[in-house]
Structures are given as structure tokens and as C-alpha cells.
UniProtKB/Swiss-Prot annotation:
GO terms for cellular component: cytosol. Binds 2 [4Fe-4S] clusters. One cluster is coordinated with 3 cysteines and an exchangeable S-adenosyl-L-methionine. It catalyses: L-aspartate(89)-[ribosomal protein uS12]-hydrogen + (sulfur carrier)-SH + AH2 + 2 S-adenosyl-L-methionine = 3-methylsulfanyl-L-aspartate(89)-[ribosomal protein uS12]-hydrogen + (sulfur carrier)-H + 5'-deoxyadenosine + L-methionine + A + S-adenosyl-L-homocysteine + 2 H(+). Belongs to the methylthiotransferase family. RimO subfamily. GO terms for biological process: tRNA modification. Its cofactor is [4Fe-4S] cluster. Disulfide bonds: none annotated. [4Fe-4S] cluster 1 binds at C36, C72, C101. InterPro entries: Elp3/MiaA/NifB-like_rSAM, Methylthiotransferase, Methylthiotransferase_N, Methylthiotransferase_N_sf, NA-bd_OB-fold, Ribosomal_uS12_MeSTrfase_RimO, rSAM, rSAM_horseshoe. This is Ribosomal protein uS12 methylthiotransferase RimO. Catalyzes the methylthiolation of an aspartic acid residue of ribosomal protein uS12.
Length: 456
């Protein structure tokens, strides 16, 4: 899904003033950012570098001298969306530079769109800048000192993604991320903390920690300590928790040491929220995926986490219809869901991905069976969500305001990440609220995925 489709409306960080009508002689660039939050961070870094070099960011195709399309290539459906976005940019603008995960397959892109100016792979920032320089030469800008230390942001001003590493060391058979983005490469802890400090100083109220494998952070650099900060996820979470913003952890692989994070949640240093992709529950399915196969131990860990921090919210994603998945294996997943009682759940129907080892597995599941299992799984997840939210009616909770219009304030609880989880709506007494405000509400009503409340 495009993060700013298709009219190119990046939300600029606090303190930066960019007129869509560039000054005479000022080079202009547009950006379309597709895919996951990790790709969005790449887009922000590219735009920050370009602004520092004097480029203006165009809010539309017509005002841009060239357009960068940051693509997703994880699934065939994502590839199709990326090709469509490239085609639209070529049609509307004509001068297009392609980067991102699909850029790891340049022949695939140029085979469909031979007129693109350049193709670069994921997180190849210097190559993207070189391509921009060739297409739209830079011009010195005496106003670059107006660029805030936090850089250019494509998210609302009050929250920001904080990427702590690139790549992944796992070899899940359905995934090609290691082929596209390489092995785990952790950022130095002091650099992560300094970036977080700048974001908080610029007004960010919520830091969303992301990577491909957040719980493996620092393994590749042997948990090195530098300038008082150690590259280990527990230490990093503690450091970030001291900055005064909400800290939310995403993409946490279910290692045993994840337990060490839970006391930090109970203490209020980081949000009581874990995004852990379990993928399945049947041991045979997990082995075919090349994933950890101890589903019973996972249930024990979940119970332990809840004992330490009863308020913890658990989000996960699953794949149904994986090659070889039998009805009995799928039923095991449904039974596991009954026991696990996860708060937030996403589910995908398996699809082949070019280059994935799972493509060669026997006994692929028929499309109509995958659809049926997906519907049954989501019905189960929806019922669990509805019951859990209904239990919140009558409680008093803190929320962060995301948006305010004439009818309501759209907020999120500590249990809800932006874009992927639900909302809490305040439809009376919300006058004077602004995005980024953190307020207390009494929960009055619940639906399957959302809440309604009254400001205290």
C-alpha cells in the first residue's frame, strides 16, 4: 500500500517550510513510497539528503522534474502494485527513478518499463542520489539550514518510525528479504539513541521501533557498547524508554530473551505491546516454513509474559494455505488461537514469490481452499478481538490523538499501532485537541476492532 498515494503528499517534519512552488532555479523531486514502514524510513532518508542538497519536494507529479518510486517486491501482488505505480509516474511525469526492494531485479523492471531513468536496490542511498543528480542537477540552496535535525518525515508529526537494523539472518522458505536486503546489519546503539533524541526534541510523541528482526538487534556486532549505549534490544529499549515518548516494538522474533523486555513494559518504560510474527501453530507447517516449531512453548511464553505484564497487547501475523497445509494442521492453528487469545491479528493467504524456496514444495493448496481457511481464521480472530474490546468498556485509558476533524478526534490506545490496528474515537468534547496530544478517556462503547470514549 502506498504511504502517500498517488498525489505525492509527504508530511514534512516540524520546522521545515517547503513551498510546492519551488523558487526560481530550485530543482524539484517527487516521491512515491510503497511497502512497509522500513521502506518508508528509506524514503525519509533519501528526501532528507536531497533537501540538504537544495532540492524542493514536489507535492504532485506536475511540479516534479523527476519522481522517485520506492518499490516493494516481497509478494507478486506487491510487485504488480509497484509496476503500476512506476507506470503511473511515467504517464504523469515521464522521468522516473526506481529504488527499493523490487530494484533488486532491475531486468524485471526495465522489461516492463524500459524508459525509467535508473534502477537501484534497497537502501542504496548513494546510488539513488547519483541517479537524481544525473537527472536533475543540484543547485546550491542558502536555506538548507532550515532543515531540522530530525530530517524530512513522511509520517504525521507526532510519531516516527525508528529503524535499528537492516537485513535478516533467518532463512524462512517463504521469504526473500535476506536475498534483497542482505544479512543482519545493526546500527550502532548510540546512533539509534541520538536519532531518537532528535525526533523527540522535534515533537515526536511516539517512536515505533522497526527492523526485519528487532529481537536480534546487535547480534552481528556482538552487542557492542559505544558512548554509553549497548547494542542489545533490552538495553536499547531501556535507553529509548528514558526519552519521555511512547516506545512501541515491532517485528520481534520470538526468542527466549524477549522475556527480558516484559518487565520494562510492566514498569512503563516501553509500551506493553509486542508485534511478533508467529506465522503458524502446527509444528509440521512451521518446519516446512523453516520457522521455530515449538508452538506449545510459545503458549507457555505468552502465559509468562501476561503474568509479568497483564496489560500486554500481543499482535501477530499468520500464513494460511502454505504448501502442504492439511485441514488438520489448519484446525490446530484455530485451536491454538483459542488458547493464545491474541489481541491483534493479521493473516495472509500464501502465494509464491519469485526466488522463494517454498515455491518448490509439494502439495500446494488450491486457491478456493486458501480463501476458505482465510475467512475462517479471520472470523475467529474477529470474535476474539470483539470480546477483548468489549471487556474494555467502562475502563479509563490513555490515548494519543492522531487526527481531529469536525466530527471526532481519532485516537489510538497504547494497544494500537498506527495504520495496522484499531482506533478510539472521541465524538464529543474533543474541541481543543490536536494531533499528538495524549489524553485520558473513559471507554463507553466497543465494536469488533474500535473503541469510543469520553474525554476525562
Amino acid at each position: 500500500m502506498s504511504q502517500n498515494p498517488p498525489e505525492l503528499r509527504p508530511d514534512i517534519a516540524p520546522g521545515i517550510k517547503i513551498d510546492p512552488a519551488a523558487r526560481p532555479g530550485q530543482p524539484t523531486i517527487g516521491m512515491v513510497s510503497l511497502g512497509c514502514p522500513k521502506a518508508l524510513v528509506d524514503s525519509e532518508r533519501i528526501l532528507t539528503r536531497l533537501r540538504a542538497e537544495g532540492y524542493a519536494i514536489s507535492p504532485d507529479y506536475a511540479g516534479a522534474e523527476a519522481v522517485i518510486v520506492n518499490t516493494c517486491g516481497f509478494l507478486d501482488s506487491a510487485k504488480a502494485e509497484s509496476l503500476e505505480a512506476i507506470g503511473e509516474a511515467l504517464s504523469e511525469n515521464g522521468r522516473v527513478i526506481v529504488t527499493g526492494c523490487l530494484g533488486a531485479e532491475p531486468e524485471y523492471i526495465t522489461g516492463h518499463h524500459p524508459s525509467v531513468l535508473a534502477v537501484t536496490g534497497p537502501h542504496q542511498y548513494e546510488q539513488v542520489l547519483d541517479a537524481v543528480h544525473a537527472a536533475v542537477p543540484p543547485s546550491p540552496d542558502p536555506f538548507v539550514d532550515l532543515l531540522p535535525a530530525s530530517g524530512v518525515s513522511l509520517t504525521p508529526r507526532h510519531y516516527s518510525y525508528l529503524k535499528i537494523s537492516e537485513g535478516c539472518n533467518h532463512k524462512c522458505k517463504f521469504c526473500i528479504i535476506p536475498d534483497m536486503r542482505g544479512r543482519l546489519a545493526s546500527r550502532p546503539a548510540h546512533a539509534v539513541v541520538r536519532e531518537a533524541e532528535k525526533l523527540v526534541e522535534a515533537g515526536v510523541r511516539e517512536l515505533l521501533v522497526i527492523s526485519q528482526d528487532t529481537s536480534a538487534y546487535g547480534v552481528d556486532i556482538r552487542h557492542a557498547e559505544d558512548r554509553g549505549h549497548r547494542a542489545h534490544i533490552t538495553d536499547l529499549a531501556r535507553d529509548l524508554g528514558g526519552l519521555g515518548a511512547w516506545v512501541r516494538l515491532h517485528y520481534v522474533y520470538p526468542y527466549p530473551h524477549v522475556r527480558d523486555l516484559i518487565p520494562l513494559m510492566a514498569e512503563g518504560l516501553v509500551l506493553p505491546y509486542l508485534d511478533i510474527p508467529f506465522q503458524h501453530a502446527h509444528p509440521d507447517t512451521l518446519r516446512r516454513m523453516a520457522r521455530p516449531a515449538a508452538a506449545e512453548k510459545t503458549l507457555d511464553r505468552i502465559a509468562e509474559w501476561r503474568a509479568i505484564c497483564p496489560e500486554i497487547t500481543l499482535r501477530s501475523t499468520f500464513i494460511v494455505g502454505y504448501p502442504g497445509e492439511t485441514e488438520a494442521e489448519f484446525q490446530t492453528l484455530l485451536d491454538w488461537m483459542d488458547e493464545a487469545q491474541l489481541d491483534r491479528v493479521g493473516c495472509f493467504q500464501y502465494e509464491n514469490v519469485a526466488g522463494a524456496r517454498s515455491n518448490a514444495l509439494p502439495d500446494h493448496v488450491a486457491p478456493e481452499v486458501k480463501q476458505d481457511r482465510w475467512e475462517r481464521f479471520m472470523a475467529k480472530a474477529q470474535a476474539i478481538s470483539a470480546a477483548k474490546l468489549a471487556a474494555k468498556v467502562g475502563s479509563r485509558i490513555e490515548v494519543i490523538v492522531d487526527e481531529v476533524d469536525a466530527e471526532a478526534a481519532t485516537c489510538r490506545t497504547k494497544a494500537d499501532a498506527p495504520e495496522i490496528d484499531g482506533n478510539l474515537f472521541i465524538d464529543a468534547g474533543f474541541e481543543g485537541l490536536a494531533p499528538g496530544d495524549i489524553v485520558t478517556v473513559d471507554v463507553d462503547e466497543a465494536s469488533d476492532y474500535d473503541l469510543w470514549g469520553t474525554r476525562v
